[in-house]
Amino acid sequence: MANFYPDFLNMQPPPNYVAGLGRGATGFTTRSDLGPAQELPSQESIKAAIEQRKSEIEEEEDIDPRYQDPDNEVALFATAPYDHEDEEADKIYQSVEEHLSKRRKSQREKQEQLQKEKYEKENPKVSSQFADLKRGLSTLTDEDWNNIPEPGDLTRKKRTKQPRRERFYATSDFVLASARNENQAISNFAVDTQAGTETPDMNGTKTNFVEIGAARDKVLGIKLAQASSNLTSPSTIDPKGYLTSLNSMVPKNANDLGDIRKARKLLQSVIETNPKHASGWVAAARLEEVANKLSQAQSLILKGCENCSRSEDVWLEAIRLHPAAEAKVIIANAVKKLPKSVTLWLEAEKLENQAQHKKRIIKKALEFNPTSVSLWKEAVNLEEEVDNARILLARAVELIPMSIDLWLALARLETYENAKKVLNKARQTIRTSHEVWIAAARLEEQQGNVSRVEKIMARGVSELQATGGMLQRDQWLSEAEKCETEGAVITAQAIINTCLGVGLDEEDQFDTWLDDAQSFIARKCIDCARAVFAFSLRVYPKSEKLWLRAVELEKLYGTTESVCSILEKAVESCPKAEILWLLYAKERKNVNDIAGARNILGRAFEYNSNSEEIWLAAVRIEFVNNENERARKLLARARIESGTERIWTKSISLERILDEKDRALQLLENALKIYPHYDKLYMMKGQIFEDKEQIELARDAYLAGTKVCPYSIPLWLLLAKLEEKQSVIRARVVFDRAKVKNPKNEFLWLELIKMELRAGNISQVRAALAKALQECPSSGLLWTEAIWLEPRAQRKTRATDALRKCEGNAHLLCTIARMLWLEKKADKARSWFLKAVKADQDNGDVWCWFYKYSLEAGNEDQQKEVLTSFETADPHHGYFWPSITKDIKNSRKTPQELLHLAINVL
């Protein structure tokens, strides 16, 4: 019975039929089924809009875009004729732009460098972060590298598939037999289809023509490869570059035999295909030398000499590879083939041991090369007699008149009069040579004619400008530096006086000259720096900055007389500069010339009658020399004529030192009427009452001061210390009031922490320190206290955190140095102490610790160096140092005595 399949798929559906509706699969309608919500524009309106847009675009294209921007003037006159005046104007504008770009170039480059370093420091590269780890990789051996495990695939998906990929099964014998039979059938089929490919031999063996064809193809490929090197058509391989690459293939040692064989074949191919190429022979010989086959290397290089007899390199290589006896024979053949080669003649001279033979070779060389400067110099050097050398040089300058070295050498061997003639002749021959003029100036300096040196240099510069041989300014300064290093100081100064202002604008020359002097000082050319300052001061005699720099230079590298000499000139040029008078008086006082110091300050009063510093300097001189009455009279006069706050405080301090407390209090009352808001007056008043053990009056003085001067930190600290003697609780109240008036102040927090430490409140100390570091994260004093509060094992970590917060703080750097010192790392400690004093030379605390370290861990030279640097720096600030210097008991002590006192108290 046949099955019936309904053919409804090919039938027409009934009306209103919706597929799937019977099973509830209803469809949905989108906006695209309904059509657009708005009516589309008509074809006419679309065409009209397109035409209108085309007309707008054409109008926009008619307007040149460069006329749209009123600030853009590019090509406004492009259609105008370009004549000579326009070209000259463009050159002028170009020169102006170049000049503007050169101005402040060094400052601009320095600023850009600082910004770059700051950016690199804030955004370090990954390579720089791991630089120290990379250096450690150099210690790994090849075995360590080979033992590094391969990275595994740790993804979950591939980790599950990995065992399946690495699962192996043994192949069945049936598969192997089938594969063997299949290969045999294919080979039989290939043999049968080629009629006559195998011919039986007379002895019954068969000839395999398939193998013969494969061998023939291999031989043909080798021949084609060899023939390709002889092609005359253009090639993409550069022959010189190819030989260079062959040289680079020479192995560094004889261990890699495979590379040696490969390089030997390549180089053999090179010298066979192109036997006239010298580099191939040299490379082949060096390869054999590296392979420890010296005889083969010698044989190869001799063949190279036969094939490339016009090549210097091949002959020089042959000389190098052979012993001295054989090398002499080779060099003899070489100079016969290349008699014009100066290098070969000089090499022949080196092979000789006796001076007579050397001279003979050089003379023979000069017959073929009479214009070789190197040969003439060698001939002169070989002569032991000055007269013979002079004769040779005279002949040399006749043959080579443009060699300035030969002229100068001849002038050095002549007498003074003859040397002048030689230099004049050299000047006439080589009119663009500056060396001749410098040599003439040095000749006059050697004869003691100092006045003629600068005249010669001035004339030389003018003639060089006329003949086009004028050097750049920097080149002249280099010549001056060279003269100083060779002992010609007067000539160096003459060069600077003549050429320092060459090519400089008036507005740039001041800063440029300061930079020149600083660069000379950095290179230890002190006389050149002196000459720069002397020239600059002639141009700017009223510049206080220049005089101070010159005085500083003399204090470092000159004598007391030279310092006083330049200070005398300075005060004559700048009589209103207080600092110059003070330095001058101090220099005289340092050499115990008290009368001279008084005389200098007396002269200073004539120009600076109201100068506070000069008054106080005069008082200091009298006080140090125990002239107390004269000091009182000077201060009384100063209070009338100047009457500044410092003069009043010095007057009160003098009375305190002399133990005249009542007179000091009387002066204080008078001073407070004039300066009621000067905090030091209240501090001194409280201290006087403390000395008199009148605690209540001292407290009243401090309280009155804090009301009038609430932002004076030392005043609050004195009040807190006074209250601490009575009660720690009252001192805390003082600190709280002070912190309200002066938030985020490191000194208040530090004294509070130290007070709690003295009271033994460790928990309070740690809480206060944590809050202090939150308010003052860049305080070196607070970080120092935090480091010393940590156990010894954790101090290094704490110091690392501190360096991130306040790098460059002198207190912190000194603390790190002390830590290293405690760990017996003396050299590292010294380097950190040097960093600390460099960060802040006015910090007396750092100098105290540095000197104490030098006394215990340094040698005598280091101690003297620290002491000298301390006296030069003359520090006045710090946390601990002012308590030593401002103590009235130490008022008459010298800085060295104060330093020794401080390190004993530390």
From Swiss-Prot:
Coiled coil: none annotated. GO terms for cellular component: catalytic step 2 spliceosome; nucleus; U4/U6 x U5 tri-snRNP complex. Residues 108-124 have a biased composition (Basic and acidic residues). One of its GO terms (biological process) is mRNA cis splicing, via spliceosome. The keyword Repeat applies. The modification Phosphoserine is found at S235. It comes from the Eukaryota. HAT repeats lie at residues 258-290, 322-353, 354-384, 385-416, 524-556, 558-590, 592-624, 693-725, 726-758, 760-792, 824-856. It is found in: Nucleus. InterPro entries: HAT (IPR003107), PRP1_N (IPR010491), Syf1-like (IPR045075), TPR-like_helical_dom_sf (IPR011990), TPR_rpt (IPR019734). Residues 50-129, 142-164 are annotated as: Disordered. SMART domains: HAT, TPR. Keywords: mRNA processing, mRNA splicing, Nucleus, Phosphoprotein, Repeat. Involved in pre-mRNA splicing. Interacts with prp6 and prp13. May also be involved in the regulation of the G0-G1/G2 transition. Required for pre-spliceosome formation, which is the first step of pre-mRNA splicing. This protein is associated with snRNP U5. Has a role in branch site-3' splice site selection. Associates with the branch site-3' splice 3'-exon region. Interacts with brr2 and spp42. This is Pre-mRNA-splicing factor prp1. The gene is prp1.
